[in-house]
Amino acid sequence: MLSELHGLNDCWNQAWLEKDAATVERLMADDYIYVAPNGLTLDRQAILAIIRSPSYRLDHATRTEVVVRALGQEAAVVRHRVQAGGAFEGTSFTDDHRCVMVCVKQIGEWRIVMEQGSFSSK
């Protein structure tokens, strides 16, 4: 189970680096929600619009400090730090966030239900 969730985390990161919208879509639960460090909430459709946007580019993304905690057999929390940079809608960004992902097993596959990012204090 833990190795599956580490794999999910790696796959999610790689999909964003490769702008692989099909994989991002497959890994998100239908009711996926992202809470950004500024409090903005983005649903599944908003996230898919970003990754599919020609103006979105992720140049690098490194996930460290990954901790997976099982919550029974069908739920887990994944905590990590992500340091990334790229551009969206003509604006460059550099991120350093601590993130929490809530994952559930649905029809035999792990899906990401929600993520929350917070600005890292380093």
What are these regions, as identified by a protein language model?
Residues M1-L27, D31-K122:
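A beta-strand edge to alpha-helix "cap/lid" segment located at domain peripheries
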